[in-house]
Curated annotation (Swiss-Prot):
This is Hydrogenase expression/formation protein HoxO. It comes from the Bacteria. Residues 128-148 are annotated as: Disordered. The lineage of its organism: Bacteria, Pseudomonadati, Pseudomonadota, Gammaproteobacteria, Pseudomonadales. Pfam families: HyaE. It comes from Azotobacter vinelandii. Residues 134-148 have a biased composition (Polar residues). InterPro entries: NiFe-hyd_mat_HyaE, Thioredoxin-like_sf. SUPFAM superfamilies: Thioredoxin-like. Belongs to the HupG/HyaE family.
Length: 148
């Protein structure tokens, strides 16, 4: 069962609930999108705070088209955007990744960081470190080799 604060985003505020199949169609039609990856609110209670903050962010940044990512597809889509902390807000220009804000921030941080994300050049997707089998040290690319 979806928590009422998260359900309110779709039922009362009309935010689309996107699955993996509908995501690309939706964001392709929007100049700027913010995707809410809530995760399980029992595991990540900050998701409920972000569910309350998100509508206020949309008021402050009306160019953002908000959407909630369906729980069944969150893990698969998380891999596309490379974040590792829940809850997360992923910002897109069309289908292009712009940035991500994870967990709950102070209101002033949102007001400072979102314009920078929207105005900036597209960020590369974050790289998830891969452990090198030879040395056990983190590497951002499986193509890198450790020197002996």
């Amino acid at each position: 069962m979806i928590h009422p604060l998260i359900q309110r985003l779709t039922t009362t505020l009309g935010y689309p609930l996107l699955d993996a199949d509908g995501l690309d169609r939706q964001v392709r039609t929007q100049p700027f999108s913010v995707l809410f990856f809530a995760g399980d609110p029992q595991r990540f209670p900050e998701a409920l705070d972000v569910a309350v903050i998100l509508p206020e962010l949309v008021k402050a940044f009306p160019q953002l088209a908000p959407a909630l990512i369906a729980g069944a597809d969150e893990a698969r889509l998380q891999g596309r955007y490379g974040f590792s902390v829940w809850p997360s807000l992923v910002f897109l220009a069309g289908e292009r990744y712009l940035g991500c804000l994870s967990r709950v921030l102070d209101w002033g941080e949102y007001l400072e960081r979102i314009p920078a994300i929207l105005a900036g050049e597209n960020e590369d997707l974050p790289r998830i470190p891969v452990l090198s089998p030879e040395s056990g040290t983190p590497s951002c690319s499986p193509m890198e080799t450790s020197e002996s």
